[in-house]
Design a protein with these regions (language model features):
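Alpha-helical transmembrane segments of multi-pass membrane proteins, especially transporters
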Residues: 119-120
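N-terminal leader/auxiliary helical segments
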Residues: 2-116, 127-337
């Protein structure tokens, strides 16, 4: 076959894979029987960047690993969402289970993979705030005849965190080779209705999809027409609380506040749906002040003083993640095309 024809076929194959991944991502967003993630990729990468800029807060052994392998840490912190249809795995093998996260870290046979494991566990610690407080509250506070779902609020948070961090998430996932880490995930994570290879393809399609210009336009229009607010001050509060849980877990592991919570938030998410139905049946949904009282009663935002967040010195975050300071990139240049 002539060289030009081969190149044309290759471009066609790549385009086909991109479109296929895109369609799988869209389908899963629209039809999926479960939440796609907790915090979105931009939020997880922003949290990872905040930690990488304040490694003086974590134990020396953890710091030494993350200083050498920041890219691998960031990949682990995003790729914990690589498995879809999680509800179909055997009991105790859910990818957002603390034991699975610990198994990934224990199975790491190199410092690079250890950094991935720390990233994975940091992701789970971060999700304890997203799934037990943020999403349940928002599901209740937006009790309307057409509920704004789990995925909407996660992407809404990502939009507030900023495009710079979403771009960095795409850079981490798409522009670097992660075969070693993916082999570890394939070894430890249980098969869902999809093979790991298919899960990985959907995951990468999701990362591409969220940066797609058409998706950005559509979601921006949704935001413009939304009557539900998410103030930057509240975004900053959730971000700092999540950072506390992440650092606390890396310091104290099983004795940390995060370890006492379910990263998937199954109980609280289920409770939020029940309380929402109750609010709608009692017409409480027409009274925002009543919904606010119910949210505070069932899913209060933690008010304990922050320990680790006030110790940040990085100007990128000290004013809050929504401060508008451009994201710093701690990862190297791309290693794959």
């Amino acid at each position: 076959m002539p060289l030009l024809a081969k190149r044309a076929d290759l471009r066609h194959d790549r385009s086909y894979l991109l479109v296929a991944s895109f369609l799988m991502a869209v389908g899963w967003l629209l039809l999926g029987p479960e939440p796609v993630a907790a915090w979105g990729p931009a939020t997880h990468v922003a949290l990872g960047e905040a930690l990488l800029g304040s490694l003086y807060l974590v134990p020396p052994a953890v710091r030494a690993i993350l200083e050498r392998f920041p890219l691998h840490f960031l990949y682990g912190s995003v790729a914990a969402d690589i498995s879809f249809a999680k509800k179909y795995v055997p009991d105790g093998r859910h990818c957002h289970n603390w034991e699975i996260g610990g198994e990934i870290l224990a199975s790491a046979e190199s410092d690079r993979l250890t950094a991935v494991g720390f990233g994975y566990l940091s992701h789970l610690a971060s999700d304890t705030i997203a799934h037990n407080v943020f999403v349940p509250r928002q599901l209740l506070l937006t009790s309307t005849t057409q509920a704004l779902g789990h995925t909407y609020w996660e992407h809404r948070m990502d939009m507030h965190v900023g495009e710079e961090f979403l771009s960095l998430a795409r850079h981490v996932v798409m522009d670097h080779a992660h075969g070693e880490a993916d082999e570890l995930f394939d070894e430890v994570l249980s098969r869902t209705v999809f093979s790991f290879r298919t899960n990985r393809r959907i995951f990468r399609g999701m990362i591409r999809f969220q940066g797609h210009e058409r998706w950005q336009r559509v979601f921006s229009q949704v935001l413009a027409n939304s009557r539900f607010d998410l103030p930057n001050t509240l975004v900053d509060r959730y971000f700092s609380l999540t950072f506390e849980h992440m650092v606390g877990y890396l310091r104290d592991r099983a004795d940390s506040p995060a370890a006492a919570l379910d990263p998937i938030g199954e109980v609280n998410l289920g409770l939020a749906k029940k309380v929402r139905r109750l609010a709608m049946s009692d017409q409480a949904a027409d009274h925002p002040e009543v919904l606010e009282e119910m949210a505070d009663a069932f899913f209060p935002i933690p008010s304990d003083p922050l320990i680790y967040w006030p110790q940040l010195t990085d100007p990128q975050f000290t004013g809050g993640v929504t401060s508008g300071i451009p994201a710093r990139k701690t990862v190297p240049a791309p290693t794959i095309s």
